[in-house]
Structures are given as C-alpha cells and as structure tokens.
C-alpha cells in the first residue's frame, strides 16, 4: 500500500498567465486522473466563499429615511444608489471598520473618486459611478465600510438595539469577497507514456483589491489547513479536556503594600520575597517569627490586618502562584 502511495504523481509545473491586473489564468499539471475536478471544485468554492475583503455595510443619506425614497435633483433612486455602492472596490489598511463621507452638488456624475478617504483607505475603482446629479442636485452621505468574509445579509448584523436607531441608517447586504468570478477546466496531460492525466486551468478575476495569484495562494492555504486534521487522524483518539485554572480571589493578587502595614513590617516581608497577599497568607506564625527584625508586635499587626479582610495566616492555596502572575511583576511590586 505504501509503494502505491509513493507512486502518486504530484504537480510539478505551475504556470501563471496574467491577463490583466485583475485577471489571471493558473495552470497546474500533471495531476492524477480525476484530481483536476477534485482540486478545481474545492479551490473554486473557497475562492468564492472564503476570501476576506471590505464592503459598504451601511449608508446614511441626507434627507432619506428609507431605501424607497427619491432624492430631488438625483437621477437614480435610493435603491439604485445602494446597488452602486455595492460595486465599490475598497481596501482598508490596518483597520476593520471605517466611516467615509461623500458630499457633492451641482450637475455632474458622482463617482467613487468623490468619496473623502482617510490615509489608510484605498478605493481601486475611482471611476465607478454612484449617481448622476442635475443642476439643483446634491448628494451628501456617510458610508460605513467593514471588513468581512463571504456574503453577509443585513439582517445578520442588526441587533435589537440597532433596530431602535435604524431610521435613516440604510443597511446593505454585503459581499465582502474580492473574487468576482472563478471558472476552471480540466484538460488532458501527458507524462512519458501516461496519457490519462489531468491538467487544471483556473480562470480567476478579482475586483483589484486582491491580486489573483495571492487569492489562489490563500485559498490553497485554507484548504491545506482544513485537511491537516486528517493527516494525524487516530481512531481511538480521546477528546482533549482543557484544564481550567481555579479562580483566585482578586484580593490575593494585590501587593502587601495595600495592607498599609508599618514600614518596618512591610520591609521585613519583602526581604523574605513576600510581595503579594497570596504569598503572605500561606506563611505560618512560626515561619514569620523567624524573619529577621519581625517581632511579635509586627506579627500581631499582620494578623489583625488580615482578619479585617477575612483572611488569616497558614491558609493553603493549591493553585498559587497563578499562571497569569508573571515573575517580573514581583520585581516591581
């Protein structure tokens, strides 16, 4: 069985034919018979459904309360304007959400280039038409742009709180995917005497916010990560039980300085590496009395202060110190 697996062909040649800035054809060969459709269909579905991107998810237009309105001096109705906004190719650098503004009046065409952009926002298709204005027309709007993946209907983002404040805020169904079109064909390939092999040709087009080659690379990575779980699959594997750390009373994580002890007592404790209240309550009276310069008077003071907080000496903490308590913290305590 092992020898037959080793004899499986793996692709040795990949060719990228750049058709335009947004379109490319990727050829992969040779593949075993049937693997062209297997890989082609999987990559196509991932490219169309799982690529991250940005889209307009909400719009506020001056004088508009709902999407069935019409704006004086604007050729398009609100529904047409919203449809045009879905065609914007937007790229966010370092942010997941941003609000943009657009303001224009007078006769002319309103395009994506009229949108006021922040330094970390880029619109690829600046000539994309949003609306047409007459002489008395004016269009002022705020656009909320978010990062996402795949297709997300407006209802999926709207909470009860949003519904109470939704008048004038027009929600858009968002298609975040930067991939506009994907198709593939499987052709015949030949290696030496074998003529029944596959050659996969992917034809991919994006909106310009993502390079076609990078899109293929990301899709292949997603597919690889999903299949990796099967590589080390064991039939008798036991479910992994995560160990949960017991909760610790927050007061135990506070420094001993919060106890407001006398300077003498506080210095004696720190000399014994007792920085936190959790460190202190685990010491016994006998252990503390062995501390240099700490006498019975200081011991009584410590016991009284702890008692006022419902604590005492000689307590046991099984999970001390917690993992969240860094050693470096003690140096600054």
Swiss-Prot record:
Print the keywords alphabetically.
DNA-directed RNA polymerase, Nucleotidyltransferase, Transcription, Transferase
Q: What's the EC number here?
A: 2.7.7.6
* Record-level Gene Ontology MF annotations: DNA binding; DNA-directed RNA polymerase activity; protein dimerization activity
Gene Ontology CC terms, in alphabetical order: cytoplasm; DNA-directed RNA polymerase complex
Q: Which domain of life is it from?
A: Bacteria
Chain intervals for the UniProt region annotation (Alpha C-terminal domain (alpha-CTD)): 248-333
Q: Which reaction does it catalyse?
A: RNA(n) + a ribonucleoside 5'-triphosphate = RNA(n+1) + diphosphate
Recorded hits in InterPro entries, A to Z, give: DNA-dir_RNA_pol_insert, DNA-dir_RNA_pol_RpoA/D/Rpb3, DNA-dir_RpoA, RBP11-like, RNAP_asu_C, RNApol_insert_sf
Classification via Pfam families: RNA_pol_A_bac, RNA_pol_A_CTD, RNA_pol_L
**Alpha N-terminal domain (alpha-NTD): annotated segments:** 1-234
Whom does it interact with, and what assembly results? Homodimer. The RNAP catalytic core consists of 2 alpha, 1 beta, 1 beta' and 1 omega subunit. When a sigma factor is associated with the core the holoenzyme is formed, which can initiate transcription.
Q: Copy the domain comment.
A: The N-terminal domain is essential for RNAP assembly and basal transcription, whereas the C-terminal domain is involved in interaction with transcriptional regulators and with upstream promoter elements.
Its function, per the record, reads: DNA-dependent RNA polymerase catalyzes the transcription of DNA into RNA using the four ribonucleoside triphosphates as substrates.
Please state which protein family the record places this protein in: Belongs to the RNA polymerase alpha chain family.
According to UniProt, the name of this protein is DNA-directed RNA polymerase subunit alpha
Taxonomic source organism = Pseudomonas aeruginosa (strain ATCC 15692 / DSM 22644 / CIP 104116 / JCM 14847 / LMG 12228 / 1C / PRS 101 / PAO1)
